[in-house]
Amino acid sequence: MSRVANNRDWADDEDLEDSNELPQSTTTTNKDGTQTIVTWRFNDDGKKVKTTRRIRFTKVKEIVNPRVAERKSWGKFGLSQKDAAGPASDTTSVGENIIFRPSTNWRKDAKEEVSDAGAMKNKLKDKQVKCRICSGEHFTAKCPFKGTMAPLGEEGAVDVAAGHADTPEGPGGLGAGKSSYVPPHLRNGGTAGGERMGGGKFERDDLATLRVTNVSEMAEEQELRDMFERFGRVTRVFLAKDRETGLAKGFAFISFQERSDAAKACEKMDGYGFKHLILRVEFAKKAS
C-alpha cells in the first residue's frame, strides 16, 4: 500500500507542490571581479519576480595619521562607556560635510572685489555730515545754534553787529497777486520773525552770541571760556572739532547772558593774539 502511495504518475504536475515557495537566492562571482546576485520575490499580483543585480566592489585606501587611527580604536569611557559603537545623538554633533570647489578664476574675482571695495571707499571718503549753520560735523537739526544764527551764506539773514536788516521787498502779509499761504516768519520780506516762547530771555541770548574765527587747532573750549568770562557771564561755548583727528576746525561760538558783555568782549578780543594766531571776533548773524 505504501509503495502505491509513493509512486507518482508521470502526468502529475511536480510544480504544484512548490507553487508557494520562492527559489533560493544565488550569488555568482564573475571573472572581472564582480558578483551577480539573483533574488526572487512576489509582486502585488502574487506573481514571482526575479531580480538580478551586478555588484562591483572597490577598495579605497586612505592614509591617515597613526595617532588618529589609534584614537579611533579607543573604547568609550566615562558616562558613555555603555553606549553603543558610533556617535550618539545626545553627546555628539556631526557637522555638515562641506565640499570645497576651487575656482580657476579666483585671482580675478579677488581683484574685482578689492577694486569695488576701494572705489566705494574713495567715493565715501569725503562724505561727511556738515551743519549748514555752523559747519560743524553734526546734523543741522542738532546744531546748538540753530535758533541763534542763520545758515552761512543764506540771503535775508540779519546782521546783528551792524544793527540793521535788509529792506523788505514786499508789503508783507499774504503774497501779492497770489492766493498761496505765506508762513508768518516769511511775511514782511522775511525780516519779521515770529514770537519766541519765553520772551526776552531767548531774545537776549540770540543777540549775545559771538562768532570767533581763526582759532588755533590746539584750542580747547575751557580755554575760550576762561578768556571770554572776563567780560561777563558766558552761557554757552561751542568749538567745532574734526571728528577723526579731534582738533579744532578754526571757529567757535561764544554766547553771553547780556548783550553789553558780548559787545565789550567783541571790542576787546577782536585782533587778540591766541596761540600764535590773531582772533577774529564778530557778532553771529541772527536767524531770520
From Swiss-Prot:
Residues 11-20 have a biased composition (Acidic residues). It is found in: Cytoplasm. Disulfide bonds: none annotated. Keywords: Cytoplasm, Initiation factor, Protein biosynthesis, RNA-binding. Residues 21-35 have a biased composition (Polar residues). Pfam families: eIF3g (PF12353), RRM_1 (PF00076). GO terms for biological process: formation of cytoplasmic translation initiation complex; translation reinitiation; translational termination. Residues 208-286 form the RRM domain. Its main location: cytoplasm. Residues 1-35 are annotated as: Disordered. Component of the eukaryotic translation initiation factor 3 (eIF-3) complex. HAMAP family: eIF3g. Belongs to the eIF-3 subunit G family. RNA-binding component of the eukaryotic translation initiation factor 3 (eIF-3) complex, which is involved in protein synthesis of a specialized repertoire of mRNAs and, together with other initiation factors, stimulates binding of mRNA and methionyl-tRNAi to the 40S ribosome. The eIF-3 complex specifically targets and initiates translation of a subset of mRNAs involved in cell proliferation. This subunit can bind 18S rRNA. This is Eukaryotic translation initiation factor 3 subunit G. It comes from Botryotinia fuckeliana (strain B05.10) (Noble rot fungus).
